[in-house]
Design a protein with these regions (language model features):
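An active-site-proximal "capping" alpha-helix that borders the catalytic cofactor pocket
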Residues: 76-80, 172-189
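Active-site-proximal gating segments in proteases and membrane effectors
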Residues: 82-109, 164, 184-252
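Short, non-transmembrane cytosolic segments of multipass membrane proteins
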Residues: 99-116, 125, 138-139
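Hydrophobic, aromatic-rich membrane-embedded alpha-helical segments
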Residues: 149-166
């Protein structure tokens, strides 16, 4: 619950402080109330913005063959059981980019989005490692703080530069390395995630083109392989790049 508590406190304190400066106490209280409601709705809103097709044993996106979809479902259901997330779901984004992201305001409402390009690129062991990484975000509460950073702070960064730093703090600059470690603790096979990250690092496209520009920009730091807000280039200063994350995993 710690990441959730910290995220809520930062949202309320940040927005209330700015409101006091701009419009006084009454407006501050009103905005604080709205931001609290935003927390409740944030993950659902972000999930709808991302879109994708839910993948189950009975349903698959056209981009995946029956065999590919069955492999994805089998791996996902096994990890749902290990993590204790029976209510989680997998959605596939029909896009050649190779990336994944997770959202959800609580563990029993988590959603993992994975691009079709990544599903087709990875073998079963690598796919398991990537899904474990994203489910670890859900279990750690990273998806809550990430959703709040996107919906509460990102729209304000254009007008108040300080909010760019606040958004990054709320999202968590160290979220990916910690999720890497949590994933290999579950799979007990670091080479699987190492191989997946190396393949992603060597792929030409990280930024999904199926997303609107605003959604891609606001979520850029929340993906398995973060990318620059304005381009497909890897994320800049403050983010641990994939090669560094691989180096950490090799030490295990």
């Amino acid at each position: 619950m710690a990441p959730l508590f910290i995220a809520i406190v930062l949202v309320l304190l940040g927005i209330v402080s700015v409101a006091f400066l701009i419009a006084g106490a009454a407006t501050a209280c009103a905005i604080a109330l709205v931001s609290s409601l935003m927390w409740v709705r944030s993950a659902g809103v972000l999930a709808r913005q991302l879109g994708g097709t839910v993948v189950t044993a009975e349903r698959r996106p056209n981009i995946l063959s029956a065999t590919e979809a069955a492999r994805l479902v089998d791996v996902a259901e096994g990890l749902f059981a290990v993590f204790g997330l029976p209510g989680a779901e997998i959605r596939v984004l029909d896009d050649p980019a190779v990336n994944a992201i997770s959202v959800g305001r609580s563990p029993d409402r988590g959603v993992v989005f994975i691009t079709s390009g990544l599903v087709l690129l990875l073998d079963r062991i690598e796919l398991e490692a990537v899904l474990a990484h994203e489910l670890a975000h859900i279990m750690r509460g990273d998806t809550v703080s990430g959703s709040i950073a996107v919906l509460a702070f990102d729209p304000l960064r254009r007008y108040v530069p300080t909010f760019a730093r606040i958004a990054d703090k709320v999202a968590g600059n160290d979220r990916e390395p910690f999720a890497d470690l949590a994933a290999v603790a579950v799979t007990r096979y670091p080479p699987g995630l190492i191989s997946a990250l190396e393949k992603i690092d060597g792929a030409p496209i990280r930024r999904p083109s199926c997303l609107s520009r605003s959604v891609a920009e606001s979520t850029s730091r929340l993906w398995l392989a973060p990318f620059d807000r304005r381009s497909d280039e890897p994320e800049g200063p403050g983010a641990l790049d994939l090669a560094e994350r691989v180096a950490v995993l090799r030490e295990l």
